[in-house]
Amino acid sequence: MPESRTSADGGMETSYGFREVPGGEKQDLVNQVFHKVAKRYDIMNDVMSMGMHRAWKDAMISALNPRKEPGYRVLDVAGGTGDIAFRIVEASGRQAHATVLDINGSMLGVGAERAEKKKLSGNLTFVEANAEELPFEPASFDAYTIAFGIRNVPRIDAALSEAYRVLKRGGRLLVLEFSEVDMPLLDRIYDAWSFNAIPQFGKAITGDAEPYQYLVESIRKFPNQENFAAMIRQAGFSRVTYTNYTGGIAALHSGWKL
């Protein structure tokens, strides 16, 4: 489970990669990371996943199986560039409406530009807000998705509680996230790739290795599959399951509001 600690001044601390920082400071630090990589976010995911994130996202959309009917509403959190939302809308035959929520305006700007180019603006709403305090009424959405974003939220338990609140009864939560590799040889290979190659590739692509170093460290600090599934259950979700992708490099977690 993610740990929060009390700092010397009495405030709560949380992990920012391998560092411990005041809870209120983590969000600002994460915002700086994604402001730096916003325009190269897809390339960043290619580097982080060795190109496999596209197949994982396709599997996520297949698992969601969005309904092909008007009125089907999905909230995609930490989805600023629109990658998941675009896939959902297309999979629904352009019937679904996706609300893309992100705390980072730079990421949302990239997503809005892409939506216009894809002629999907009518199916999308872009909202700048915090996953821990969603600006929506209870029971507003049929599905809640978040891909490679939950580990960057300072209070994951609060984000999961908010997900439960805004879902309709019968609504589904899907969380795609880097996870704990469960194959002995693969874990060593991926560790070597993560801590040696990824920051250097990031520096070559963006001129700055630091954001990539944080992202690698944040994966190691994130709860493993069983512990994160327990957090989802604790938030109130039922029928909680997870599916490992590529030996556990990533995992898709699913839960229902019943």
From Swiss-Prot:
Residues 1-21 are annotated as: Disordered. It catalyses: a 2-demethylmenaquinol + S-adenosyl-L-methionine = a menaquinol + S-adenosyl-L-homocysteine + H(+); a 2-methoxy-6-(all-trans-polyprenyl)benzene-1,4-diol + S-adenosyl-L-methionine = a 5-methoxy-2-methyl-3-(all-trans-polyprenyl)benzene-1,4-diol + S-adenosyl-L-homocysteine + H(+). S-adenosyl-L-methionine binds at residues 81, 102, 130-131. It is an enzyme of class 2 (transferase). Keywords: Menaquinone biosynthesis, Methyltransferase, S-adenosyl-L-methionine, Transferase, Ubiquinone biosynthesis. Pathway: Quinol/quinone metabolism; menaquinone biosynthesis; menaquinol from 1,4-dihydroxy-2-naphthoate: step 2/2; Cofactor biosynthesis; ubiquinone biosynthesis. GO terms for molecular function: 2-methoxy-6-polyprenyl-1,4-benzoquinol methyltransferase activity; demethylmenaquinone methyltransferase activity. Its EC number is 2.1.1.163, 2.1.1.201. It comes from the Bacteria. Pfam families: Ubie_methyltran. PROSITE patterns: SAM_MT_UBIE, UBIE_1, UBIE_2. GO terms for biological process: aerobic respiration; menaquinone biosynthetic process; methylation. Belongs to the class I-like SAM-binding methyltransferase superfamily. MenG/UbiE family. NCBIfam families: MenG_MenH_UbiE, PRK00216.1-3, PRK00216.1-5. HAMAP family: MenG_UbiE_methyltr. PANTHER family: 2-METHOXY-6-POLYPRENYL-1,4-BENZOQUINOL METHYLASE, MITOCHONDRIAL (PTHR43591:SF24), METHYLTRANSFERASE (PTHR43591). Methyltransferase required for the conversion of demethylmenaquinol (DMKH2) to menaquinol (MKH2) and the conversion of 2-polyprenyl-6-methoxy-1,4-benzoquinol (DDMQH2) to 2-polyprenyl-3-methyl-6-methoxy-1,4-benzoquinol (DMQH2). This is Ubiquinone/menaquinone biosynthesis C-methyltransferase UbiE.
